[in-house]
């Protein structure tokens, strides 16, 4: 919505040419990100923003196409292509492209025939032939060479994602590696080769399996299908259908790539530590060759029928094991429209987790279990959504009426006149904080490019929002919410529509560990100006002080913006008082003798400040953050709440009911089940998830006893942590004033949660009805951590199981197609008195469980050795440490972490110093000593009736535990 009077132009677009080696750019005057926008001669867009916080650069390469452009007969294609972009080019990923290509062509033709077959026996035979030819082609395939290239330049966060409108390739690189990065990416986008096809297809299908248990995704897909019945947003999903995934077309993939992966449909987005002109010179050198001899033709996108208005409200449903809820959605204009600004503000007015209409009228008054409102922007159309979860005995229709009731309050203007200004201030606060992140900046660039938004409109967003009035919002709400909606009820039950597909017979492809392309060697041997590491010096980077009552203070100055974080750290947690966590949750529903709970939340929101209470295993944090100028008022509010919280017995009974319902809902979630099962396996019955007040204890305890735990908390000795604008003396004076007269006592001692040793092989099995298993193999021999081993363990984890170039990723995913996600690590503790342990992790299809166990045990008992991979792992860790900067509140966190480990220095300093001496033999010997041929606890969450229990029993005795046992309620 473009409101009159809102577009007071604060910035001026600079459209004059600025020459730097003939590169013309545009920028917006007053843009806080100082983004420059360039365009190469082939139409490739480049967005650059300098941020010298760390010597690293966040890079996106965004292609303006996604799943909405998938051919209707091969949905999931855009996402699958994203995966294949990691398989290499004509220059890397292959030992000999000339010899390899005929077999790749043969595989392509065979898949075209295979996808048309319907007879099961014929399909099985054809797949066996594809598998056989793939074995021959794999002789020339060098798996994961892209990941080796990224490791060699010290890249971090190697990834990609596909959505409806965009496919984006992500890297975080050292600032001295732009030339190598650009060289690799330019080759990748110009010379992509489809190889490793059938094993990667299985990885995609494993990703699909994970989604089958994600009821939220299922619900959202249904919402889209009803809101956009004749647009790809609603007619097809990004992951694709089972049938299409099992019947792919390489021909269609190549045609899609040729049509959409062109320079004038692509943008490079970079934010970090660099020189604009130098980066543009490099990008021009490598990317200007892309389609250089072809005329720039506008990309022709499919045209879709115009959406007709919904004639009636639509109600539909989906079913799944997770907790029931309702999702409602209204159609909105495209994300690049000014209407998006207004809907983001409307969402914050309704739900901002503090003082929105839904927060105060529904959640605070415990009229439902919880919910929210949000805007989802797409390039063609968007969605305004509301969601709600019922409390015990409440129907989804009841929740729907509550949500619609808040829409009516919005339309009638039934909200405080202070709410909109508070929303605007908090949105500005969030925006300014986001600018600290390179990734947030590249997100903004990508969204602007994909949605066709002018950069001037992006930078002026806050000024447009600043001018909005309550009257305009109310008028808009009456127009917008006059349209019909779609409501999707998420019912709880078994989804009988999910079809099980048997695993294909895949012959593991060779890894060719010692092979490397000339291209990789060139990049590895390229000379770059090294970046010297900078380690935290706790004597220089951190200031220490004491309050008047001798509470230690750790202080770091904020020289960047007007924000602060103040945290009171108490040296005990749930291990000393299991009431604390429930007390902290209950506190959010209470006021004081002077202010109601609603008034407190409104006041915090008006101050653009927030507070939280985190109860950990061995420490508790009371944290306040927000605008530094309002810190004294925010601290006073928190102190008053903790000291003078007013018990509300009626609210407590409702709180107990909601808590029990929330607990039951969490027992229906697969990932929560696995997290809880893993804790049960590693720690036994006494662990952080079970050491809570039972349902019966919640019902019988006096609410005043809960609040007494928090009132006592404020009197325990603690450490003050501050990152902000004020100088140390002013911070101490503020705290002294607030805590004057308080008599502090020593904190209580807790009983530690203890990691259990593994004395023999055993299996812990818990039930969850899904098409896949979650599994951990855990070994603990009570080895104690020493700083001298840190470098060795760091290299081992990088080499064995911590990256896409690791042994685990290659063996489990690349060669066998057993999983979408697989990893392993030797876990070091956060405290010196806690042992180290070894752990593997995988999510896989039920009928692949034994294959996964056998594969893991094989590489654990005989660790594969490859000097090339080891050298790259060491190089990656070296460059990552050299370009990592610990800043801001992170300095305080690093100090506390070091103190818990019993050292007084930055551990990265020792790792960096010891790295050069680590050899492949060292990590092989380490693995043999700590992991190979050792007893393991196999922690498995899965549907027993679909698992090979007889094969499992041959590995170790099985201990079955119920859902109630692992949760403790």
Q: At which residue positions do the language-model features occur?
A:
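N-terminal secretory signal peptides that target proteins for export/translocation
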Residues: 1-2
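Sec-dependent N-terminal signal peptides
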Residues: 5-14
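Proteolytic maturation boundary segments
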Residues: 18-48, 275-319, 324-325, 329, ...
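M16 family metallopeptidases and their MPP-like homologs
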Residues: 49, 54-67, 76-78, 94-187, ...
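Active-site His/Glu-centered metal-binding helix of metallohydrolases
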Residues: 77-85, 583, 796
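Short, conserved charged micro-motifs
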Residues: 178-180, 276-280, 338, 394-398, ...
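A common structural junction motif
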Residues: 187-194, 287-294, 404-415, 640-649, ...
């Amino acid at each position: 919505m473009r409101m009159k009077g809102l577009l007071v132009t604060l910035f001026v677009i600079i459209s004059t040419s600025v020459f730097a080696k003939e590169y013309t750019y545009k920028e917006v005057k007053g843009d806080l990100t100082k983004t420059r926008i360039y365009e190469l001669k082939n139409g490739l867009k480049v967005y650059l923003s300098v941020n010298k916080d760390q010597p690293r650069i966040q890079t996106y390469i965004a292609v303006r196409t996604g799943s909405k452009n998938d051919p209707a007969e091969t949905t999931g294609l855009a996402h699958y292509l994203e995966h294949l972009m990691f398989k290499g080019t004509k220059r890397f990923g292959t030992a000999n492209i000339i010899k390899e290509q005929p077999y790749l062509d043969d595989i392509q033709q065979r898949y075209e025939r295979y996808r048309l077959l319907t007879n099961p026996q014929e399909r099985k035979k054809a797949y066996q032939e594809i598998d056989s030819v793939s074995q021959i082609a794999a002789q020339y395939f060098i798996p994961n060479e892209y990941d080796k290239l990224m490791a060699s330049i010290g890249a971090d966060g190697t990834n990609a994602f596909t959505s409806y409108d965009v496919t984006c390739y992500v890297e975080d690189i050292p600032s001295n590696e732009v030339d190598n990065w650009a060289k690799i990416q330019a080759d990748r986008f110009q010379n992509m080769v489809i190889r490793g096809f059938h094993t990667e297809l299985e990885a995609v299908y494993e990703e699909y399996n994970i989604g089958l248990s994600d009821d939220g995704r299922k619900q959202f897909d249904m919402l889209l299908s009803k809101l956009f019945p004749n647009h790809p947003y609603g007619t097809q999903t990004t992951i694709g259908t089972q049938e299409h995934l099992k019947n792919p077309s390489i021909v269609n993939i190549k045609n899609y790539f040729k049509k959409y992966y062109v320079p004038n449909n692509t943008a490079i987005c970079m934010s970090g530590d660099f020189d604009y002109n130098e980066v543009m010179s490099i990008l021009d050198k490598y990317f200007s060759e892309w389609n250089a001899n072809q005329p720039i033709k506008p990309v022709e996108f499919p045209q879709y029928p115009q959406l007709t208005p919904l004639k009636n409200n639509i109600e539909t449903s989906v079913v799944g094991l997770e907790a029931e809820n309702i999702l409602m959605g209204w159609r909105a204009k495209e994300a690049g429209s000014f209407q998006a600004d207004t809907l983001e503000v409307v969402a914050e007015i309704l739900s901002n987790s503090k003082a929105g209409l839904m927060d105060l009228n529904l959640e605070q008054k415990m009229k439902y279990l919880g919910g929210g409102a949000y805007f989802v922007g797409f390039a063609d159309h968007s969605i305004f959504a509301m969601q709600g979860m019922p409390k015990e005995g409440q129907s989804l229709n009841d929740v729907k009426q509550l949500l619609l009731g808040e829409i009516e309050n919005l339309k009638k203007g039934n909200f405080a006149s202070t709410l909109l200004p508070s929303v605007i201030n908090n949105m500005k606060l969030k925006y300014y904080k986001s600018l600290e992140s390179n990734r947030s900046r590249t997100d903004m660039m990508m969204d602007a490019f994909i949605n066709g938004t002018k950069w001037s409109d992006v930078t002026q967003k806050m000024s447009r929002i600043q001018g909005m009035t309550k009257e305009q919002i109310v008028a808009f709400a009456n127009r917008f919410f006059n349209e019909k909606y779609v409501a999707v009820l998420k019912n709880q039950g078994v989804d009988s529509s999910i079809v099980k597909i048997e695993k294909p017979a895949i012959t593991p492809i060779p890894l060719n560990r010692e092979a490397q392309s000339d291209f990789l060697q060139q990049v590895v041997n390229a000379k770059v100006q090294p970046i010297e590491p900078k380690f935290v010096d706790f004597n220089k980077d951190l200031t220490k002080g004491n309050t008047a009552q001798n509470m230690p203070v750790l202080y770091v100055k904020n020289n960047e913006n007007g924000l602060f974080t103040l945290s009171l750290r108490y040296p005990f947690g749930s291990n000393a008082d299991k009431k604390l966590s429930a007390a902290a949750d209950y506190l959010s529903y209470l006021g004081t003798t002077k202010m109601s709970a609603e008034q407190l939340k409104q006041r915090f929101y008006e101050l653009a400040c927030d507070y939280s209470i985190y109860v950990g295993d061995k420490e508790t944090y009371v944290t306040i953050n927000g605008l530094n100028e309002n810190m004294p008022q925010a601290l006073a509010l928190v102190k008053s709440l903790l000291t003078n919280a007013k018990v509300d017995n009626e609210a407590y009974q409702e709180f107990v009911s909601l808590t029990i319902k929330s607990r039951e809902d969490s027992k229906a979630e697969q990932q929560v089940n696995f997290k809880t099962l893993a804790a049960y396996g590693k720690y036994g019955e006494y662990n952080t998830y079970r050491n809570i007040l039972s349902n019966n204890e919640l019902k019988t305890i006096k609410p005043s006893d809960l609040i007494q735990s928090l009132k006592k908390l404020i009197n325990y000795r603690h450490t003050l942590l501050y990152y902000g604008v004020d100088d140390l003396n002013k911070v101490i004076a503020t705290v002294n004033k607030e805590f004057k007269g308080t008599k502090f006592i020593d904190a209580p001692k807790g009983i530690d949660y203890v990691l259990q040793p593994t004395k023999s092989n055993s299996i812990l099995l818990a039930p969850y009805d899904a098409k896949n298993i979650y599994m951990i193999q855990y070994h603990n021999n009570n080895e104690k951590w020493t700083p001298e081993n840190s470098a060795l363990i760091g290299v081992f984890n990088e080499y064995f199981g911590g990256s896409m170039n690791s042994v685990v990723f290659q063996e489990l995913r690349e060669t066998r197609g057993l999983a979408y996600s697989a990893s392993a690590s030797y876990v070091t503790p956060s405290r010196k008195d806690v042992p180290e342990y070894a752990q593997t992790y995988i999510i896989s299809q039920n009928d692949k469980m034994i294959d996964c166990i056998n594969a893991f045990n094989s590489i654990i008992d005989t660790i594969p050795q490859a000097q090339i991979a080891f050298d790259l792992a060491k190089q990656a860790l070296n460059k990552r440490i050299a370009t990592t900067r610990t800043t801001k509140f992170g300095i305080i966190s690093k100090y506390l972490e070091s103190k818990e480990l019993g050292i007084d220095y930055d551990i990265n300093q020792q790792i960096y110093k010891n790295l050069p001496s680590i050899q492949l033999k060292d990590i092989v010997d380490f693995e043999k000593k700590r992991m190979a041929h050792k007893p393991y606890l196999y922690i498995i969450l899965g549907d027993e009736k679909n698992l090979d229990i007889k094969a499992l029993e041959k590995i170790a005795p099985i201990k079955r535990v119920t859902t109630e046992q692992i949760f403790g309620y």
